[in-house]
């Protein structure tokens, strides 16, 4: 059986964390979740710890970091942890539902069943699909993506 891990970095995601974890855990393929919490002062880590002990024992994991170290640096210990624990498939997503958890199924299918070594989701395939972002952030992200492809 192949193992699948979703890495979710968090900072002050108390309002979303239980819902995003539940959404991923309820998917049919048995995903595991690794939360990388940057010392959220709002109690995000406490919610995750409770879910680890009561609801998702063995499938929910957490790395707590001291202080807000940033999104990019959160993925490094997450990927190292996934490799150390020999996960076959590693995914990353945001805690605020700006990524649709159902898309994990499509990404998994691309790698497991269609022969892709890497599958990358984009908010800009088939139009812009961004949730909970102000228009300025959407435009900046969209044009930054276009610029990177051009360069």
Please annotate each region the language model reported.
Residues 1-23:
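N-proximal low-complexity "stem/linker" segments adjacent to membrane-targeting elements
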Residues 2-4, 25-35, 43, 59-60:
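Short loop->beta transition adjacent to catalytic acidic/histidine clusters or analogous donor-positioning motifs
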Residues 15-19, 42-51:
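Acidic helix N-cap motif at the loop->helix transition within catalytic regions
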Residues 17, 24, 78, 96:
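Residue-level signature of catalytic and energy-coupling elements of molecular machines
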Residues 21, 30-40, 63-64, 93:
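Short beta-strand/loop segment that forms part of the nucleotide-sugar
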Residues 28, 48-53, 82, 111:
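Conserved hydrophobic residues forming the short capping helix/wall of the S-adenosyl-L-methionine
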């Amino acid at each position: 059986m192949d193992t699948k891990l979703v890495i979710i970095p968090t900072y002050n995601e108390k309002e979303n964390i239980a819902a995003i974890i539940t959404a991923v855990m309820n998917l049919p393929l048995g995903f595991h979740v690794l939360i990388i919490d940057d010392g959220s002062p709002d109690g995000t880590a406490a919610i995750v710890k409770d879910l680890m002990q009561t609801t998702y024992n063995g499938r929910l994991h957490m790395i707590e970091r001291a202080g807000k170290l940033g999104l990019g640096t959160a993925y490094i210990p997450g990927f190292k942890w996934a490799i150390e624990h020999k996960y076959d498939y590693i995914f990353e997503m945001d805690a605020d539902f700006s990524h649709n958890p159902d898309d994990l199924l499509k990404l998994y299918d691309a790698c497991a069943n269609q022969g892709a070594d890497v599958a990358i989701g984009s908010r800009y395939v088939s139009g812009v699909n961004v949730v909970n972002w102000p228009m300025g952030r959407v435009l900046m992200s969209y044009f930054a993506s276009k610029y990177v492809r051009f360069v």
